[in-house]
């Protein structure tokens, strides 16, 4: 099978895990005026990419994928604990848990998941997105680097979808923004691959505050 097909499958918005229903604080940033147009949206997404994802979320995901590929189950279990402890708000915790559960349900119904990975999933009754993504990459024979690229693209695509629903930003403007942000995806992937995952730490205060405020936002399009 062409390996590109598996990669496209993992990155597809049709993957039934519900990523489209979350904004990761962006809806609140639009509500309070921090993000009001394409330029401010670019700044918000760039900061999230390079200051949060590249330094913490992406290296953590990469470590999950590497441990799953090598069948290092004790290491993967440790990473699961670190991931769970790093969710700074209830919204982010529930988002990762719900998407991880949906991905677990998907993988359990597919023949590609091997017995060892299936047993590991059965032992972890509280799944999360990074774990599901790593085991999907293992099942579909996707390298950790490619799995990270798919995850970064999926994140960016979802953020742009949020913008088109909350701002007067059309599809062509979103595509122009995509062209501007693609080099940052490459930079985020490279930065993440150079970071030692032992230990990792995050200090994304702006994101945490936006997510906490979003939990109490009066009118919302996206889940909290």
Curated annotation (Swiss-Prot):
- Print the keywords alphabetically: Chaperone, Cytoplasm, Nickel insertion
Q: Which Pfam families match?
A: UreF
Drop me one GO molecular function for this one.
Answer: nickel cation binding
A single Gene Ontology CC term = cytoplasm
Q: Where in the cell is it found?
A: Cytoplasm
* InterPro entries per UniProt: UreF, UreF_sf
Question: Which family does the entry's similarity section mention?
Answer: Belongs to the UreF family.
This molecule's function is given as:
Required for maturation of urease via the functional incorporation of the urease nickel metallocenter.
UniProt name for this protein: Urease accessory protein UreF
Q: What is the lineage of its organism?
A: Bacteria, Pseudomonadati, Pseudomonadota, Gammaproteobacteria, Pseudomonadales
Task: Name the gene.
Answer: ureF
């Amino acid at each position: 099978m062409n390996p590109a097909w598996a990669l496209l499958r993992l990155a597809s918005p049709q993957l039934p895990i519900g990523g489209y229903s979350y904004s990761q604080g962006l809806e609140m940033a639009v509500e309070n005026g921090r993000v009001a147009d394409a330029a401010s949206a670019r700044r918000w997404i760039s900061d999230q990419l390079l200051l949060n994802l590249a330094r913490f979320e992406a290296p953590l995901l990469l470590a999950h994928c590497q441990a799953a590929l090598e069948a290092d189950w004790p290491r993967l279990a440790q990473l699961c604990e670190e991931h769970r402890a790093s969710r700074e708000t209830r919204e982010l915790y529930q988002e990762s848990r719900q998407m991880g559960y949906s991905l677990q349900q998907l993988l359990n119904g597919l023949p590609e998941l091997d017995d060892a990975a299936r047993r590991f999933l059965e032992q972890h009754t509280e799944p999360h997105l990074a774990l599901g993504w790593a085991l999907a990459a293992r099942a579909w024979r996707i390298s950790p680097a490619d799995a990270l690229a798919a995850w970064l693209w999926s994140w960016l695509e979802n953020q742009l979808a949020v913008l088109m629903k909350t701002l007067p930003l059309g599809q062509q403007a979103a595509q122009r923004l995509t062209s501007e942000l693609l080099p940052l995806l490459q930079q985020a992937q490279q930065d993440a691959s150079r970071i030692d995952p032992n230990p990792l730490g995050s200090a994304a205060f702006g994101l945490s505050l936006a997510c906490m405020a979003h939990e109490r936002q009066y009118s919302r399009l996206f889940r909290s």
